[in-house]
């Protein structure tokens, strides 16, 4: 994370008159390993300004439960590799534990890589907050999303 990242982002948001709590900054676990004091300071500044912080791909790579305790995280995104295991006993144990833990820490839980109705139903049954994946839509460009949104909200 660059030295003045937080200050520059806040400045841009103010210049464009964007409501800060409508902005979600998505980070990966990898960024939390490097220069943790500097990263913590930047994330706290952004969070205090009203920007939401989302931790992407949780459970892969450099996961540490201490990140959830230390950093101001609003959204916890469960990696697709866990969602793919909703059919297995151990897979369900991991997903349910992540959902419960995140919610107890006042985080919204997002399941990534949802591809079928069985996954949606299971995630609903364990009170997962949000879902994303091909079941709902393939990745879209800004223009395609605008068209998609107009059709869905007629």
Q: Where are the regions a protein language model picked out?
A:
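Helix C-cap/alpha-to-beta connector motif
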Residues: 7, 11-22, 49
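Structural preference for long, well-ordered alpha-helical segments in enzyme cores
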Residues: 8-13, 42-43, 98, 118-120
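Short, flexible, glycine/charge-rich loop motifs used to bind or transfer phosphoryl groups or to couple energy/partner
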Residues: 13-16, 41, 65-67
